[in-house]
Every structure is written in structure tokens, then in C-alpha cells.
Amino acid sequence: MKVAVIDYGMGNLHSVLKSLQAVNENGADIFLTRDPEAVVKADKVVFPGQGAMPDCMRELNRHGLAEAVRETTQSKPFFGICVGAQLLFEHSEEGDTAGLGLFPGKVVRFADDQVAGGERLKVPHMGWNQVYQTRSHPLFAGIADGERFYFVHSYHFAPADAALTLAESDYPQRFACIVGRGNIFATQFHTEKSHRAGLQMMKNFLAWDGNV
């Protein structure tokens, strides 16, 4: 089994690769690539992302990878992480950027005036936060509802279709932090920075056949 981790220069790539390799129990060939053909030929695809969405979209197009992402999401198990997940939506408020349009909806910024417990919440949302599962999914196997994952983001998903939301978190209002449909699964948090729970989710992805 070949698992492509898309390298377009904008992700926490080596940490993602190392985390996947740490839970690779069945000898999968897990590799970084910026070759669109290699992405399309892979059996599974991981799409990390870190930084500003306009920069990520520009680099994705510069390397000719946007169409490869669109093609692989049609049928293969696909895992988007952080900005890699945000890019799946139609539009982001960050830099008024068009996304790949695979999911209906947009990516919006947290309000700067949010208050919880009498204190103003900082943007970006950074640190450990609980994730509440709203739908069952194979990638939740072995992960408790309310488990903590590691977040670093100023923008979050606003899906136009509620059925896309698989899990939510609070900051302080509820927001979608895992979205998915069919063979696509995408997280706002960084699985590669989320210790045991993040590794379990990556392990589940390697075992997943893309069916829900």
C-alpha cells in the first residue's frame, strides 16, 4: 500500500511523516511527494497544511497539485490536516481566498472579542482542547469522546451542510473541528502534535478502506 503525504512546502511535513511511520504496522510505503502523478497513483493521501491559506493555495497551484487533490478525493481514503483541511472548502476569509470547492461552505476567522470566564480569548486558538464526536466514524476507533487534541489556528470551518460535521470543539462557541464525507476525513487540529490520540487517529487512517 502506498500512502502519499503531499509536499507543497506549506505543512508540518516531517512531523506528519514520522507520526504515520510510527503507527505503520503493515509495511505501508509512506512517502513525501510533490509529484501530482505520484499523488494520483497512491492508495491513500494525506494533505497537511500550515501557514496562511492564500500562500498554501498559491503553492498548491504552483506545483500543479490542485487537480491531483481533486482527483484523489473522488475515491481514495484522504486525510486533510489543519490548512490542508481548510483548503477543501469553497472560500476562506483569510485573504479572500478561493479554496478547492470540494466541500460547500467557507472558512471564517474567530471573533477577536470573544470572552469566557470574564477573560477575552486570544486569537489564534492555541493549545489543547476537547473534541466532541457528533457522528460515528471508523477513524474514532479507540478514541474517547471528549479527548483532547492540539490546535493552532485563527480560522475555522463553517460548513454549509451540517452533515459534513463529524466533531466539534468549543472556543467558546461550538465550531466544527472534524469534517468528512465518504472517503474524505479532515481535521482542524494537528494530529501529528496530539500525542496518543493523534497517533491513534493516524493508525486508524492507515487501516481505513474509505468506507463509512
Curated annotation (Swiss-Prot):
SUPFAM superfamilies: Class I glutamine amidotransferase-like. One of its GO terms (cellular component) is cytoplasm. This is Imidazole glycerol phosphate synthase subunit HisH. The active site is at 82 (nucleophile), 190, 192. The keyword Hydrolase applies. GO terms for biological process: L-histidine biosynthetic process. IGPS catalyzes the conversion of PRFAR and glutamine to IGP, AICAR and glutamate. The HisH subunit catalyzes the hydrolysis of glutamine to glutamate and ammonia as part of the synthesis of IGP and AICAR. The resulting ammonia molecule is channeled to the active site of HisF. Heterodimer of HisH and HisF. Its EC number is 4.3.2.10, 3.5.1.2. GO terms for molecular function: glutaminase activity; imidazoleglycerol-phosphate synthase activity; lyase activity. Pathway: Amino-acid biosynthesis; L-histidine biosynthesis; L-histidine from 5-phospho-alpha-D-ribose 1-diphosphate: step 5/9. It catalyses: 5-[(5-phospho-1-deoxy-D-ribulos-1-ylimino)methylamino]-1-(5-phospho-beta-D-ribosyl)imidazole-4-carboxamide + L-glutamine = D-erythro-1-(imidazol-4-yl)glycerol 3-phosphate + 5-amino-1-(5-phospho-beta-D-ribosyl)imidazole-4-carboxamide + L-glutamate + H(+); L-glutamine + H2O = L-glutamate + NH4(+). It comes from Chromobacterium violaceum (strain ATCC 12472 / DSM 30191 / JCM 1249 / CCUG 213 / NBRC 12614 / NCIMB 9131 / NCTC 9757 / MK). It is found in: Cytoplasm. InterPro entries: Class_I_gatase-like, GATASE, Imidazole-glycPsynth_HisH. Keywords: Amino-acid biosynthesis, Cytoplasm, Glutamine amidotransferase, Histidine biosynthesis, Hydrolase, Lyase. Its main location: cytoplasm. It holds the Pfam family GATase. Residues 2-212 form the Glutamine amidotransferase type-1 domain. Gene3D superfamilies: 3.40.50.880.
